[in-house]
């Protein structure tokens, strides 16, 4: 009898420990046209300090090298440090205000960010200029189940709607996740009206304006907005993780009870304990 009891106990798997919740948000950061991940990280030094208690940024570099500037000397080689997520002009360049053009290389960039998103286990998106345009597209694609990226929130600085023909149907339904939209009143590269139009594709967008031009501001006057936004996002993220862990723990208890409720289950069930 004692041997049978011992055998029964040995076949019962020990409860899988709950996964410790992440203490910070992990956010995929997408740079602008003719930028790269390292340069974008350098530019956001003050911003990263503001949000460092609540969030960590994961920087990725676009896969496409931008061509030399139009006023470059003949024979100038492309600068590998100047990157683009896609090109929306037939000459293989990009301009935010261009309409009804192609989206050359977009699918390659989509595959890249999907890979990094999964590897880094990110939960939010941040983008600047072309990167913010990309973030807007990713949010829409996610809502329609057309990408593996599932952002909980998004931050878009100097963003705009893509004018590429293949993207024109991406803004028919409003995105239902929390979003912070940042733009400069004096932005001459992406006029504020374009950023406002992108913000209008989100439900209840939070707007932060500044008197400057084409950059993501990180001054004392913006700090409170950033801190409060990311603190709230972290709170919701941790609460969701707690619910997920509790659900997983309850599932394990149900599995451990066995089909007859005697704490014994078949060998085939052991693999399920790791889910």
UniProtKB/Swiss-Prot annotation:
Q: Which domain of life is it from?
A: Eukaryota
The transmembrane residues are none
EC numbers listed for it are 3.1.2.-
Q: Which InterPro entries match?
A: AB_hydrolase_fold, FSH-like_dom, LovG
Enzyme's top EC category:
hydrolase
Q: Which GO terms describe its cellular component?
A: cytoplasm; nucleus
Q: Which Pfam families match?
A: FSH1
Acidic residues composition bias: residue spans: 266-275
Q: Which family does it belong to?
A: Belongs to the LovG family.
The protein here is known as Esterase AAEL000016
């Amino acid at each position: 009898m004692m041997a049978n009891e011992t055998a029964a106990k040995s076949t019962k798997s020990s409860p899988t420990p709950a996964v410790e919740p992440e203490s910070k948000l992990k956010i995929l950061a997408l740079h602008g046209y003719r930028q790269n991940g390292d340069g974008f990280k350098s530019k956001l030094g003050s911003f990263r300090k503001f949000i460092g208690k609540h969030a960590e940024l994961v920087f990725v570099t676009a896969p496409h090298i931008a061509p030399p500037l139009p006023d470059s000397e003949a024979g100038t080689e492309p600068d590998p440090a100047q990157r683009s997520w896609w090109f929306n002009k037939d000459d293989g360049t990009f301009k935010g205000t261009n309409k009804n053009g192609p989206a050359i290389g977009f699918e390659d960039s989509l595959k890249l960010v999907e890979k990094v998103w999964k590897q880094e286990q990110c939960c939010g998106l941040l983008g600047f200029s072309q990167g913010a345009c990309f973030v807007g597209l990713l949010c829409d694609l996610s809502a329609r189940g057309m990408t593996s990226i599932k952002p909980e929130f998004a931050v878009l600085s100097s963003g705009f709607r893509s004018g590429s023909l293949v993207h024109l149907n991406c803004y028919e339904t409003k995105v239902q996740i929390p979003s912070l939209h940042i733009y400069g009143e004096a932005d001459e590269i992406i006029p504020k009206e374009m950023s406002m139009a992108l913000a209008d594709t989100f439900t209840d967008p939070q707007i932060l304006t500044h008197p400057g031009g084409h950059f993501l501001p990180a001054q004392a006057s913006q700090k409170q907005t950033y801190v409060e936004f990311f603190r709230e996002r972290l709170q919701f993220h941790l609460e969701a993780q707690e619910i997920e862990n509790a659900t997983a723990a309850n599932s394990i208890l149900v599995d451990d009870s066995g089909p007859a409720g005697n704490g014994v289950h078949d060998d085939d069930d052991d693999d399920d304990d790791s889910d």
